[in-house]
Amino acid sequence: MSETVTQTETDQRPATARSLGAEEKEAKSDEQFQQERTIKGFRWFIVIISILSSVTLYSLDNTIVADIQPQIINTFDELDKLPWLSVAFLVACVATNSIWSKIYSQLNAKWLYLFCVVLFEVGSAMCGAAPTINTLIGGRALAGLGGAGLYVGVMTLLSVNTSKRERPMYIGMTGLTWGVGTVLGPIVGGGFAVSKVGWRWSFYINRECRPSVQPIRPLTVPPVFFAAVAIPIYLFMLPSFDPRPGVSYKERLAQLDYLGTILMIGACVSGVMAINFGGQIYPWDSGQTISCFVVSGVLFIVFGLQQWYCIGTTKENRTFPCQFLARPAFIILFVQTASVATVFFVPIYFVPLFFQFTRNDSAIDAGVRLLPLVCFIVAAMILNGALMSKFGYYMPWYLVGGCLSLVGSVLMYTIKLGTSTANIYGYMIILGVGGGMYAQASFAVAQGKARPREIPVATGFISLAQLTGGTIALAIANSVFLEKASAGIMAVVPDASKETVQSAISGASSSFFQTLDPDVREAVLAAVTHAISQVYILPITGAAMSISLAIFMPREKLFVASDSGDRDGVTPLGAMG
């Protein structure tokens, strides 16, 4: 028996031999994940507010570009590169998410998180000062790279600084800050787009800047507060967490999966490019689109083989946490998270678009229209975190949330040009409550089910699902909308060129709609509304998937006290895989 145990332990060790003292220190690191929170009182309040505020900046950057694209096109006059503004950010987020989670499992979470915050701020500054659209795209990629690390860092810091029982509540709070940033993104972006100072200040507000221009002084005070107050708090009040005490940095860096990292980045970049550019820049059957799909598919296959056979790495240090694929619990949580990301990302982008086209809303007014959706998403997230911590059951949240999301998505699909605003708000509320009930739940469930040292990796695993689901859903939704809207408009106005129609849809040429006769304009808007309604097939599919998977989730308690629980007072883990 002892020989078997020894062999198993040997197989799981990295290639570099570790001393017994280092192993003992790593065992102590495992205990740090499980112990009660050490920061108390007002200090904890300040720390948690500072950590959560960075989620606001990250979510703000996700949605701020939507309403300033026409101004960016007018500045640089390069419509063909417009998709890159979102693609660069999304590619950097998706491609590096798993990598960041592995790095967080090796290096000090506090200092790595600070590095990601700085990286994100530098990317935002680059966007604001960009002399060319290529520089702007590069800044978006850098901001996405830092933002992905920042988001994984927030979840990691919350997991290592809270007890298991209170963790769902604090993770639920990320929904509040995410919602604030999501709502402010279109509003702030639209406000700067129509102001004298211009769209560049939409990116400057994500970094420390001097409020020297009087018209935007009120909007620059909060970012100055974040940069001037939050970073010193991170430095002096946030406790350090070293996941591998006693292990040299040379050994830690040697254990990163560099080959897997390169393969994953290449596969993600080519895949996201194919989905985003297909039907927009290039036809779906063009050589460019097909080549991107083929390259992505080949690289994903090679990446899968490299991870499975541990080529150039070990089972313990693989970029992708393949061990979770052997646990049904984590597979279900991954798909659930990707599905709910589809449910709320699609309406967040297309609700403002609907009101801009059909109600002639300004960018600011269209952003405000999101309030019913986002407010109820946030409220449901907070309620989920509080009640799931108290009662422990998590399966009902997925089942009921999926059902409400399905109802809300179907209702959004039925919206026509003449549908009243009150009805649309009601549909959004149903959708928001449903999606919010389980939007962030998987983070807490996965962290509760993971082994102590797997918590950063489990966080990255669920974050990857969220980003992947949202990225693919938005890419497909954009392609469907552009294709359906272009075809519908050209059927009504056959003399219009495809380039003119696509420019009008993107917002770069509003004069196209103004020159149409009233009857023709109404027919065109009806075609646009029909195109927008088609994108809600994706949330319908995502909600249906959530309901189907929820049926197979166990009826277990995960976060509440039990007589046989561990020393944290939570039920034993692993009942679901």
Curated annotation (Swiss-Prot):
Residues 21-31 have a biased composition (Basic and acidic residues). Keywords: Glycoprotein, Membrane, Transmembrane, Transmembrane helix, Transport. It is found in: Membrane. GO terms for molecular function: transmembrane transporter activity. Glycans are attached at N317, N360. One of its GO terms (cellular component) is plasma membrane. Its main location: membrane. It comes from the Eukaryota. Disulfide bonds: none annotated. It is a multi-pass membrane protein. Residues 1-32 are annotated as: Disordered. The keyword Glycoprotein applies. PANTHER family: MAJOR FACILITATOR SUPERFAMILY, MAJOR FACILITATOR SUPERFAMILY (MFS) PROFILE DOMAIN-CONTAINING PROTEIN-RELATED. Belongs to the major facilitator superfamily. TCR/Tet family. This is MFS-type transporter pgmG. It comes from Aspergillus terreus (strain NIH 2624 / FGSC A1156).
